[in-house]
Each structure stands twice: as C-alpha cells, then as structure tokens.
C-alpha cells in the first residue's frame, strides 16, 4: 500500500525531526516541550517507514504532527532529506541521534561535519558506539577549542 505524506498547514518553520521507523513514539503535543535552550516549541516532524500502522497515522493527524514516508521497512535517509527539503524547506539539519540514527546517516554518506564535545563526566552506562554498523568514513580536524574543562572538536569530511 502506498501511503501519503501528511503536512498540515500550520507549520512553525522551526523543526525537530524524529526518525521513527515503526511509529512507536507517543507525542503529547505537536511541538517539543523542553526547558533546554534551543528546543522548546520546535514543530515535530515524524519520518516513518511504510510499515507503520494506519492507527498511528490517524493519531499523528489528530495531533497535527506532520509525517513523511522514507522507505518501506528501513529509513532511506536520502529520500527523507529530499522530502524534508522539498516539502518543508529544510536544507540542512543538526543530527543529534543515537548510534542507530547516526549510522543511517553515515552509511548514506550525507554527514559532512562532526562536532564532538569531550567533558570530564563519568557515566554508569554501557558503552555505545557513536555510529551503529558504520562504514569507514574519513574526516579531518577543522577546529578545536577549550571551554573551561570541556573540549570541542569540529571535523569535516575529507
């Protein structure tokens, strides 16, 4: 079944794109409600695969959350980026995914810059890769800065 993208009329122009292949996220609003600077009131956009149940699509429509389809069973990043550009006017994104989403983008070859922050914090969490199932991509150091006890490194694709 070919499913149609859903783009409501009342879009904000400030977006948070969620890659949700199976349609599992239960949003309470169509905007991000977060006290962290830079995220509050961002319009949520769901990127889905065609395997998502019609009931979830009805839920997103009732919440006026835009969604686009990008792949049958797995997210096709290039389709997603093209649709975000043509349907929403989004030309570049800040990727803040976990290792799975980061891996989608890395394997698609669409990451042109990596910004890493090293902070002196010890966490009690299991080790997780930055990119799941990645290919070998090479980047070169563009810039490095120290902010108090934190180091920021900016890399660009070779």
Residue ranges and their predicted role:
Residues 1-158:
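Enzymes that bind and transform nitrogen-containing heteroaromatic metabolites
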């Amino acid at each position: 079944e070919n499913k149609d993208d859903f783009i409501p009329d009342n879009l904000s122009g400030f977006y948070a794109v969620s890659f949700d292949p199976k349609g599992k996220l239960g949003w309470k609003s169509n905007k991000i409600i977060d006290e962290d600077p830079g995220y509050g009131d961002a319009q949520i956009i769901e990127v889905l695969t065609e395997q998502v149940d019609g009931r979830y699509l009805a839920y997103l429509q009732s919440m006026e959350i835009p969604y686009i389809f990008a792949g049958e069973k797995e997210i096709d990043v290039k389709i997603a980026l093209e649709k975000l550009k043509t349907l929403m006017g989004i030309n570049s994104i800040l990727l803040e995914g976990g290792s799975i989403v980061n891996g989608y983008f890395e394997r698609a070859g669409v990451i042109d810059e990596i910004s890493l922050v090293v902070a002196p914090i010890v966490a009690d969490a299991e080790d997780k890769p930055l990119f799941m199932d990645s290919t070998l991509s090479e980047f070169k150091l563009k810039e490095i800065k120290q902010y108090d006890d934190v180091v920021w490194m900016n890399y660009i694709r070779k």
